Amino acid sequence: MEAASSSLDSFFLDVSLIYLYAVVSDRKGNIMLQKLYVFFMKETVLSIAVILALLSMFWVRPDKDYFTYIDFRTLGLLFCLMAIVAGLKAVGVFDILAKKLLMGTSGTVGVIRLLVLLCFFLSMVITNDVALITFVPLALIIVHKLPKELGNYWLLKIVAMQTIAANLGSMLTPIGNPQNLYLYAKAGMSAAELITLMLPYSATALILLLIWIQVAAAKAPHVCGSEKDKTLLGFSDRKELNMEYLAAYLILFTICLLTVARIIPYQIPLVLVLIYMLLRNRENISRVDYSLLATFIALFIFIGNLGRIPQFSSFLERILAGRETLTAVLASQIMSNVPAALLLSGFTDNYRALIVGTNIGGLGTLIASMASLISFKYIAKENRNLRGKYLGIFTASNIIFMIFMLILYFFLR
């Protein structure tokens, strides 16, 4: 009887242990799924790029040719530029520059105009996403200094204006955005050629932005005493510039520009930036957008593998032939303009058309340019209830600008 009882106890103990193991495993599985979901939502483009790269490996097994897919020059330059700009931002260069410019500006409309133009012009040098990371929070601070009615009027409009300004300003230079940097290197163009190609679009965009600001200002509610209103109080007091860091990053930036101009090889700035950060400014290493670099690598693998699948390669080449710009515009609406540039460049050598198409393609949907998501996140953080209204203003404005850019494209072709 005791043996039977002991056997029964042992049975229930085994069942309990199995159940406990199943529960723990299930919980671990759920935690893992939750982590994957959070990562996917946070890094959607990277996640999709990795999935596509892995799927393509079923058709083209990994081999030594995979290394030929990677454009190490573009990756090296992108890393250097992100590290240098992050360093300059951490030093406080952009805050000080903006403060000095705003000190010479009077009136609400003047301040709004300056905040938009800062995004437009500085995006040409510090990239569109860094311009938005720097100046959208500043715009939100300043808007909150305005009388409530006036602040509510400008809040969503100025962020939409800044986003469009950063995307359209960045298209003028090779270092303004990642797709320009990649396609410029791929095409073997000179900086002057790219600037000449995109100048009509940037000039038109600037005129449209200034008109938009004036039209919006004319419709703004008139509130007494709504001028500058101590706007500069939004700036936190910063310690003095670290001149060593400033000088070092400016020298490194100059070396990067020489690399962009193909005067020196990319390995030189890459080694110098790494040595300087490791020896003098290690915390800056964490400020680099490694997810963007990983996205590039995954897409290089995906595109390289597609190029080795004859059926797909010939199909995409037929679709692109003579329609490179419009295809790039449409592809950007779905997958964003950087992945579109990487994908389509593997199946055509008409890089000039892709440069125009992916830059115009940065307008339109919220994901057409990943930089646009930065502004959206700031609005969501400001007030989640404003997301829908902002999306409406942003999308309508983007479509209007895209129509003008496409009209200009058909006129110039």
Residues covered by each model-derived region:
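Juxtamembrane and boundary regions of transmembrane helices in multi-pass small-molecule transporters
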Residues: L33, A192-R238, L373-R413
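Intrinsically disordered, low-complexity non-transmembrane regions of multi-pass membrane transporters
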Residues: Y21, S25-L46, L52-L55, A217-I251
